[in-house]
Amino acid sequence: CKADLTSEMVIELPALQGVMGREYALMHGEDPIVAEAIAEHYRPRNVSDTPPQTTVGRLLAVADRMDTLTGYAGLSITPSGSADPFGLRRAAQGVVQVLAGESDAPPLSAMQIMAAEAYREVNGLDFPIDTVLSSLKTLFDQRIEAFLEDLGIRYDLREAALEGGLVDGTVVRCAVRRAETLQSL
């Protein structure tokens, strides 16, 4: 799904990431569902962008970002202060935005473990799982709170909604619902 990144077109016009991937996939005979997922998996590009509309696009968007985040966490590379040269906060924010609309999302920790195991099996890298999970939990806690803030949820209501902890993907959706319910009272 990253073949378009090697093209001159995407180098010249970065906004065509995904769009060109879809076109290349269709030209090479890929199923239109797969081609659309390739186009969508870059979304959301920022907090004002919408998540992918197709199920395959949402799955690919989350899987790609979780792979990236887990890989960097395994190498002990995490955002610090204002420094985030690899766009890890943006990647985590994208996962949160996608999962916020999913009622049956798999656990974040399970996705992280699967990504770490894939690094071990495919690349021979053995990440310290506990360290990776701890690092990613901190990052996702921050991103979920930022997401609720972007929704206009007051600070005290965000804190109350997040009191139960943020371990699973389903908790992202639950935290959003709790915060919105508290805000409506």
PLM regions and their residue ranges:
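Amphipathic alpha-helical "coupling" segments that flank catalytic cores
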Residues: K2-L185
